Amino acid sequence: MEQFDGFEYSKRDLLGHGAFAIVYRGRYVDRTDVPVAIKAIAKKNISKSKNLLTKEIKILKELSSLKHENLVGLLKCTETPTHVYLVMEFCNGGDLADYLQQKTTLNEDTIQHFVVQIAHALEAINKKGIVHRDLKPQNILLCNNSRTQNPHFTDIVIKLADFGFARFLNDGVMAATLCGSPMYMAPEVIMSMQYDAKADLWSIGTILFQCLTGKAPFVAQTPPQLKAYYEKTRELRPNIPEWCSPNLRDLLLRLLKRNAKDRISFEDFFNHPFLTSPLLPSPSKRILESARSPLLANRRIITPQSSLPVPKRAGSTKLDSPTPVRRIGESPRVQRRVITPGMPSPVPGAPMQESTDFTFLPPRQESSPVKQVQVHTNVSPSLTTCKPVPVPSQRLTYQKMEERLAAARKTAVPSSSSPTGSAVSAQHQHQHQQQQEPASSPVVQRIERPDQLPRRTTLQDPNAHDIERMTMPNPTFVVCGSSTKPSPNNANRVRRSTITSPADTQDMVAADQMLSNLDPTTTTTTIPKSATTANIQGIPRGARDRSVTSPPQPTIHENEPLDNAKYQQTDVNNSPTAPTEPFIIKNQTTCSTSSTSSSVVEEEEAMSLPFASGSHLAAGFKKTPAEVPMDHGALPPALDQEIVLGEEHKQILAKLRFVAELVDTLIHVAEQKDNPLASAMASRRQLLTTGTSTTNTSSPYRRAEQLVVYVRALHMLSSALLLAQTNVANRVLHPSVAVQQVLNQLNDKYHQCLVRSQELASLGLPGQDPAMAVISAERIMYRHAIELCQAAALDELFGNPQLCSQRYQTAYMMLHTLAEQVNCDQDKTVLTRYKVAVEKRLRILERQGFVAAVNT
């Protein structure tokens, strides 16, 4: 502990430092519970600045005599042979810069509370003829009187500090010294013109603008560029958001005047209505943006069924306004618009003005992405529900099921008011729609008529290529089943389970009659789940999203039970004994056989491998022999519909599955960017491995990174859905169960990314920040792929090859995508070389049985 004149401090308790001094947290020697701030100034550093130090001490003593609540008080000044110590009161809340770093932006209640106190402090020093000349968030200290970790803003007291650049100005005297921080300097100061105390008013306006929007009103990469901007711009107009209240808008415009003579006077500033009048309710930022955005004003926002309402960002007070805010994530997924021939097209609204990083364009006239493959019932638009389209080969079966259910509900409500009763087959509706419906009634949207489907707004991305022109990686790699628990990075990357259906009506009826005789160890046939499906709440969310790929079903009312328990998949976990024979998945394969232990054998896709055409079997996979006896009355395996379809159909389906897998990875990357701890850890890893860290962990920067990733995902999804629509219209892609499932997944992911992008855009981005210019989706994808390879290499090094398979597979997929999309031949060569290196590692893992290669 260093001691002097009744005070002590430790050099480890550093609070901050400046050009001439270091500030420590100290205390009284005889009162150790009373903290103080000790500014230690080494005499060797002030040999040429003694006058500056003397002036600061004089100003601090002058202001301390006022004992003003909003000015940092000087407790004692002590000189030793080596140092000059200024002992000042300690502020336990940090400074405004730290507060803004945590909160990003402040609501107007908080801004008003802070600016009133700043005005009181400024009024006090102005009466003494003092101009601060270095007002910035770092010199505005906060005192937390509540002693709580997260105090309410009304418990925070503002104190002005650091009068090192302050000076006395007599009436009418102008200064011409260049000092202060360039971003907060008044134009007359940075242009080396004479200035007076009104320079502090400009700094106050800049600080208020930053509190409101999270960025400075005028930004340049260097001080000379900012100076040049001020010199050539005669009329400075800050871009104040529309949701700003009139009083605050007026105050900002009057503070941020280029000419000091036109700037608001101190008297008018101290008595401005924003400081003296209670705040009037102002429109929410999100409501105003919703009103002018064509996507929010003229469309129903549809959230994925599995997504939760968008939470409020941690640490942000922007949404704390008492005015009601319309949450984007609250609209139910089943709300869809029924298109009628007489309905006018929505008029496009004004484009988003605050965020220029991307623009939502109107639908293209020549083509549009396909809507989710579902029929729309002929009920009112507000009560529209979605029904799955039956597989063409199963329409007769589906119709018989509906007739049997209708006969069992003779005493129930009429089918016209029942969601289930209205879900007749697409074929049945097509036969009777002209006789039953007038020309002006809503028409049923069928997959055979893609031109009638509602059009989705398309996101254009000049850096990304269309999915149609993308080639599939050859080979693709599939991670084999393992009893090892997946790592957190791969928690949401569980492979899809096999979804099959009976081949014909006889199989379906037989399944109903023989349900009680089926052996749970050999039953694998499933169809899309209904309300009677077994509870899956215990399954992790990521596993649920990937393992159940059936299209989402509408809610079934209690008075309309469906007799489809026979289509449920028997849970292997509930089997009293594990099978002793190889676990059989119909016409499919496994990487291992089940043992007599209680471990669960994970299903693998062979005929419907992700990204594979479905006609090839992986090496080491074992196809179910046709002559295997079906014990315990089990049904013979049904023929997979994808086998009999054309090769082009299989290739397109494989490409759609590849996009779904890739978008899952992009969403995972974007969610990682939302976690400040994960970003800080990534920056730390980069510092340890390369010696330098280029990762920016600020909240606006992370939001910008999330936004570009979500926009890239939106483009890929839009392109994939457009590809599907075109090929469905040309009868190349058939509406099979697998196609419906993957299109439903793509549709859900599209709405999830769209809602999240709009949420991020509504928070605002510092568009003039030069750090934002280097953000790109390709850079983020490349960095993530390299990090996956590094983590996988460490897993191999420490003898955990079972953990690295998924990481290598994901990196292989992302490197292939980047190599397909880049335009630079040199970049493509580097990416291809890295991809080949990862492929070699996967080949080694293939020989060890951890992955299986499939030629596409």
Curated annotation (Swiss-Prot):
Enzyme class of the recorded protein, top EC level: transferase
Result of changing residue 358 to A: Impairs the interaction with lgg-1
Segments forming domain Protein kinase: 9-275
GO molecular function, one term: protein serine/threonine kinase activity
Gene ablation phenotype (knockout): Worms exhibit various abnormalities in axonal elongation and axonal structures. RNAi-mediated knockdown causes abnormalities in constitutive dauer formation in daf-2 e1370 mutant including a lack of autophagosome formation.
Entry-linked Gene3D superfamilies: Phosphorylase Kinase, domain 1, Transferase(Phosphotransferase) domain 1
Listed cofactors: Mg(2+)
Catalytic activity: L-seryl-[protein] + ATP = O-phospho-L-seryl-[protein] + ADP + H(+); L-threonyl-[protein] + ATP = O-phospho-L-threonyl-[protein] + ADP + H(+)
Protein name: Serine/threonine-protein kinase unc-51
